[in-house]
Amino acid sequence: MDYKQIVTAALSDALAGQLTRDEIASKLERPKTSDKGDMAFPTFTLAKLLHQAPQQIAQDLAEKLDKTSFEKVEVVGPYLNFFFDKGAYSAETLQTVLTAGADYGQNDDGQGGNVPIDMSSPNIAKPMSMGHLRSTVIGNSIAEILTKNGYHPIKDNHLGDWGTQFGKLITAYKLWGNEADVKADPINKLVEYYVRFHKEDVDKPELDDTAREWFRKLENGDEEAHELWQWFRDASLQEFNDVYEKLGVTFDTFNGEAFYNDKLEEVVQILKDKNLLVESQGAQVVDLSKYNLNPALILKSDGASLYITRDIATALYRDRTYHPAKNLYVVGSEQTYYFKQLKAVLQEMGVPSADDLEHIPFGLITVDGKKLSTRSGRIILLAKVLDDSVKLAAEEINEKNPDLANKDEVAQQVGVGAIVFGDLKNERTNNIDFVLADQLKFEGETGPYVQYSHARAESILRKAGKVTITTDGNQISDPEAWDTIKTLADFPAMVKMACDEFEPSVIAKYAIRLAKTFNKYYAHSKILTEDAELPARLALVKAVSTVLKESLRLLGVQAPDEM
């Protein structure tokens, strides 16, 4: 029973076509308190159209409305406040949730369309820092949300395993490296060399020339350069996979930049065939002036390829392999201009899926307000943050519930979940200043708070034993239950909104809202009292548990049954 559609239809009939149904639906509001109804329609925008005072319009509409679907409709100033039939609405909502289970909110809007998601994409020979968290968890959550909306996401970890940085790294290793040191501690040593290179090249510009020469050798298949590159790549991947395992994130492909090296010639040839390449100071560029963009540099004057050259090859490969319905790049906001250029080049080339390319930008993670940087050596390792979070979660759980049977497993779920949820509750374009202790609080808008709310619901159900659950909403008389039921009914709309906006925070904020309404209900109601309403109250608790768990799953967070 979609009351938004019912309200929209009733108003549409009363307005006799003066507003479209979409216009009406967009104006509907959820009152902040239940005494003002369950849905409200403001009449301000109709005042100019009808040349009447909003209060008079509200009165006239109230008289014309078919009110049979509502408990009552009240006029309060310029607002029409709709009160739903609580019994019917509650029964249908609970029945829908409990029948569907984890599939509640599922839709087939995507019709199975493929959606490659370029995500995570760390650079080889650099550790995964907190700066890599956002693309990884945002991309993973978007993939889950897309699946819930009927799409087929392909999670593509487009590793940064090629580029001029490898010339710098090989140069640094040849100058200052030691094989035994690297084998003993690969990533930390490689980072040490990389940071040293950038410190020393300030006074020694010839280092950049050497680095460029080593990268040219790598591109030309030089045996020593390739062996060093492969070694750096293998060592890095092992560390990356350890972090992904902690996060519970998997990928469908790890096709890094190097995978596309043999596809670059075709890119250049297509650009030439379409007369898109023009020479500029010895380099080859694509003129994008008609898009009000700077030229896209495709080949340097020495013939070396650039990042965009490989990204064009990647987009062509994905287009031919997946025939995507959407083509997503979960990359930081600082790359917005670059993705405008990439999309424009693909459109000029006539790539079929070019129009469906969407950059999904996100803000920075800072610590003490400062940006993280591998070059400057300002790195906070993601693996260490996750381990520290699990350790703090274990201490908190041991204090709150020392007899918990599976404390280590729950600490892992809570500690990692706190970091993931702490990121995803923020609108993705916002910057985040990271404070670990804030993420781990069991009260407030945190992952542990939502997880604890789910565990509380599961605890109630265990204590209830084998009581038969009923979805007869007429039997729930608690006023706090009504807010919880309305929140449960919102979930399918939140799933759609999160998909339309590629915004996991929609789900995270919804989970917080549901947890809050449930905990308010829990505080005001004696749920396990053995009376006629017990089966209906348990149905509500079961529905809350189901939807909280599914909300957390969409975010890539686990929901422990006990905490």
UniProtKB/Swiss-Prot annotation:
Gene3D superfamilies: Arginyl tRNA synthetase N-terminal domain, HUPs, Isoleucyl-tRNA Synthetase, Domain 1. GO terms for biological process: arginyl-tRNA aminoacylation. Disulfide bonds: none annotated. The keyword Protein biosynthesis applies. GO terms for cellular component: cytoplasm. Belongs to the class-I aminoacyl-tRNA synthetase family. This is Arginine--tRNA ligase. It comes from Levilactobacillus brevis (strain ATCC 367 / BCRC 12310 / CIP 105137 / JCM 1170 / LMG 11437 / NCIMB 947 / NCTC 947). The gene is argS.
